[in-house]
Amino acid sequence: MMYSRFRTVAGNLNCAAKRLSSSSTTTTTTSAPSELQQNLAALRARLAMESPSLSDFISLKSDNAYSVEVGTKKKPLPKPKWMKESIPGGEKYVQIKKKLRELKLHTVCEEAKCPNLGECWSGGETGTATATIMILGDTCTRGCRFCNVKTSRTPPPPDPDEPTNVAEAIASWGLDYVVITSVDRDDLPDQGSGHFTETVQKLKALKPSTLIEALVPDFRGNAECVEKVSKSGLDVFAHNIETVEELQSAVRDHRANFKQSLDVLMMAKEYAPAGTLTKTSIMLGCGETPDQIVKTMEKVRAAGVDVMTFGQYMRPSKRHMPVSEYITPEAFEKYQTLGMEMGFRYVASGPMVRSSYKAGEFYIKSMIDSDRAASS
């Protein structure tokens, strides 16, 4: 219907144009210009009445013709009251930050914008200061949808002085417990496992009393890489499965998967000296169901993992996957209780918990010390 109106109007315009052209080349009576002007005025009026307007293409929700919603993006979920963050500070916090800048070292605390940075670096309520140092550079070869770390297929080569710098820095801070993690380095022949091992060994040589948790990538499931790091002298071998089995492909890089991660944790338990703890972590609020969480916990426990942590997924930026749900503190408590009933030696579960959050708290430290005393 609308297109037929356009054709009629176009035909009338052509007729008017021909008459206008004819009047410019021939001499007519004085009444011709008057007739032409009347025809043009009539066409303008008809065009104004029949031309399509904005309302022909959209349905308006209000009297304001231009008050329309653009796009289909969902509004982000508002943060609930229990997700408040504390402001970093304290003498130990300042000391650690200054030393990091001097030695050009990276921490996952800063790279991942962890909300617990201030509490961990300053020692929090227990006075046990912890930090998570990120080695092998600040650029990852993978691109998980939840992670804020930079990515590249060809990141810069590792700094050969990094193991020494990291060991000396941590030894000077007097930390009771440190987490050493790294980006994925699929570009390196040994996935960075040699660099990781050297860092742990140098720190243990300088400060044997410091408990070391190595939060490692999956090394693409390479048993030789896992064995090398497991026997480096660490106290806790950690590798995160990140989310429930059903959401792996939606959350993690395509080179990571649930089975591969479980295999890494089982290999670590086999290769590491007796008394070495294994640990993993998952984020909640990515779209998982309670049943999926429980099934994942059962499989992790069956793999012999000692420690498991649960925390709320927090979207680092608008470029990352949105938060599907904010899990209540009560739900986190239930998963903690269930985990202990399943046989995990320790479960940390709460909205603000991260894989290395309060890693050096008194309970875990006491557990490691107790195990060693019993075996000696």
Curated annotation (Swiss-Prot):
CDD domains named among the record's database cross-references: Radical_SAM
Radical SAM core domain span: 125-345
GO molecular function terms listed in the Swiss-Prot or TrEMBL record: 4 iron, 4 sulfur cluster binding; lipoate synthase activity; metal ion binding
EC number: 2.8.1.8
A cellular component term, taken from the record's GO annotations: mitochondrion
Residues involved in [4Fe-4S] cluster 2 binding: 140, 144, 147
Species per Swiss-Prot/TrEMBL record: Pisum sativum (Garden pea)
Domain of life assignment: Eukaryota
Cofactor(s) listed in the protein's UniProt record: [4Fe-4S] cluster
Assigned protein family: Belongs to the radical SAM superfamily. Lipoyl synthase family.
Miscellaneous information on this protein: This protein may be expected to contain an N-terminal transit peptide but none has been predicted.
Main location: mitochondrion
Keywords per UniProt: 4Fe-4S, Iron, Iron-sulfur, Metal-binding, Mitochondrion, S-adenosyl-L-methionine, Transferase
Reaction(s) the record says it catalyses: [[Fe-S] cluster scaffold protein carrying a second [4Fe-4S](2+) cluster] + N(6)-octanoyl-L-lysyl-[protein] + 2 oxidized [2Fe-2S]-[ferredoxin] + 2 S-adenosyl-L-methionine + 4 H(+) = [[Fe-S] cluster scaffold protein] + N(6)-[(R)-dihydrolipoyl]-L-lysyl-[protein] + 4 Fe(3+) + 2 hydrogen sulfide + 2 5'-deoxyadenosine + 2 L-methionine + 2 reduced [2Fe-2S]-[ferredoxin]
Cofactor, free-text remark: Binds 2 [4Fe-4S] clusters per subunit. One cluster is coordinated with 3 cysteines and an exchangeable S-adenosyl-L-methionine.
Annotated binding of [4Fe-4S] cluster 1, by residue: 109, 114, 120, 356
Pathway per the UniProt entry: Protein modification; protein lipoylation via endogenous pathway; protein N(6)-(lipoyl)lysine from octanoyl-[acyl-carrier-protein]: step 2/2
Record Pfam families: LIAS_N, Radical_SAM
Protein name (record): Lipoyl synthase 1, mitochondrial
Gene3D superfamilies: Aldolase class I
Top-level EC class: transferase
HAMAP family for this protein: Lipoyl_synth, Lipoyl_synth_plantM
